[in-house]
């Protein structure tokens, strides 16, 4: 595995002069700024416009060259359109996810349905938005615990990502600069609790720890790492509920994802940099057509992907590392 540790924030100022804008894109640029609530200083607008135009051209070229109509996979210009590649990586590529051997509680011969969506069973809270803070690891872990809390109590309570960010630093996490789900689960287990979003709301920046035990709404007794193969992941998902996973999310095609079954030829299974929640699986078309997918909840808001979710190839040799770093808690 190639480790990816911590990246420095890219300064907004760029030394090189921005190229002259393509005035044919003026109306599209103004509409994009309006719909994404962007305002800039005059100098910054030149730089951001240049980046945005480059991304527009890349998306058009990528669609033309790669035939993204396959499996209905599409990309689009979204809220990340004025960000450089390095800036987009800041949202994901903040910590390496070391591969771990796993073991999990497994029922004998669990019945595997042809499709599964834990959202329909009430296990999944609404999609949230991490913003410019690289806290995907915390969103993935809290969402996973939320599902187990619902399974145990029947109550679906959004948990505090901010609590996890602020208070798990001594376990190796870095707030908005990244963290590992294993360390986050370890904190919640040892801490004896985690607050709800309602009492410890998300602020998209790390602060000092303000956890109060009397406001805790959940405890984690232990947690399990799933063996690194898709069959074990499938069994764990069916048996236990939503699973915290990590994938290679470093590519522009990921940040520009709109819908369909994701396809990225450069996606790796041993370089993991983005945490998500695995909530189900299914297939497009007929089951015999081998267009199977995993269904994942992201933390980029509902305007990204399929209302905040994405489909990743299933049964394709651990595509993008979907089964390389999966875990879930027991309450």
Swiss-Prot record:
Q: What is its EC number?
A: 3.4.22.-
Question: According to its UniProt entry, what is the function of this protein?
Answer: Involved in trophoblast cell proliferation and differentiation probably by affecting mitotic cell cycle progression. Proteolytic activity and nuclear localization are essential for its role in cell cycle progression.
Q: In which tissues is it expressed?
A: Expressed in placenta. Expressed in parietal and spiral artery-associated trophoblast giant cells, most abundantly during the phase of trophoblast invasion. From 14.5 dpc onwards, expressed at lower levels in labyrinth trophoblast cells. Expressed in trophoblast stem cells. Expressed in heart, liver and testis.
- Keyword Signal part of the UniProt annotation: yes
The region annotated as signal peptide is 1-17
Q: What are the TM regions of this chain, as residue ranges?
A: none
GO cellular component terms? endosome; extracellular region; Golgi apparatus; lysosome; nucleus; perinuclear region of cytoplasm
Q: Which UniProt keywords apply?
A: Cell cycle, Cell division, Cytoplasm, Disulfide bond, Endosome, Glycoprotein, Golgi apparatus, Hydrolase, Lysosome, Mitosis, Nucleus, Protease, Secreted, Signal, Thiol protease, Zymogen
Q: Kindly state a single biological-process term from the GO annotations of this entry.
A: negative regulation of mitotic cell cycle
**Listed Pfam families:** Inhibitor_I29, Peptidase_C1
- On whether Kinase is a keyword of this UniProt record, the answer is no
Residues cleaved off as propeptide: 18-111
Its name, as the record gives it, is Cathepsin 7
First-tier enzyme category under EC: hydrolase
Q: Which residues are glycosylated?
A: 72
């Amino acid at each position: 595995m190639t480790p990816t540790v911590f990246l420095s924030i890219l300064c907004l100022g760029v030394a090189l002069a921005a190229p002259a804008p393509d005035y044919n894109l003026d109306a599209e640029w103004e509409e994009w700024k309006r719909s994404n609530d962007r305002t800039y200083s005059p100098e910054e607008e030149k730089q951001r416009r240049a980046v945005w135009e480059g991304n527009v051209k890349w998306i058009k070229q990528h669609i033309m060259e790669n035939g993204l109509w396959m499996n209905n996979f599409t990309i689009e210009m979204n809220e990340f359109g004025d960000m450089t590649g390095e800036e987009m990586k800041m949202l994901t590529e903040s910590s390496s996810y070391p591969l771990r051997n796993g073991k999990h509680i497994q029922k004998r011969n669990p019945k595997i349905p042809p499709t599964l969506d834990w959202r329909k069973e009430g296990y999944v809270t609404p999609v949230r938005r991490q913003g410019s803070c690289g806290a995907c690891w915390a969103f993935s872990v809290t969402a996973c615990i939320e599902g187990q809390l619902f399974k145990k109590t029947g109550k679906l309570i959004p948990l505090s990502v901010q609590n996890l960010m602020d208070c798990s630093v001594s376990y190796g996490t870095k707030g908005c600069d990244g963290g590992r789900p294993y360390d986050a689960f370890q904190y919640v287990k040892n801490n004896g609790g985690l607050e709800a979003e309602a009492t410890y709301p998300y602020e998209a920046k790390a602060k000092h720890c303000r956890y109060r035990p009397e406001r805790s709404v959940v405890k984690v007794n232990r947690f399990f790492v799933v063996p690194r193969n898709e069959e074990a992941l499938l069994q764990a998902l069916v048996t236990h509920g939503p699973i915290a996973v990590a994938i290679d999310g470093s590519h522009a095609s990921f940040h520009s994802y709109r819908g369909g079954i994701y396809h990225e030829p450069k996606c790796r299974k041993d370089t993991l940099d983005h945490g998500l929640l695995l909530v189900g699986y299914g297939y497009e078309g007929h089951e015999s057509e081998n267009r199977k997918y995993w269904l994942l909840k992201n933390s980029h808001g509902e305007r990204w992907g399929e209302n905040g979710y994405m489909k990743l190839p299933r049964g394709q040799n651990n595509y993008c590392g979907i089964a390389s770093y999966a875990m879930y808690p027991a309450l």
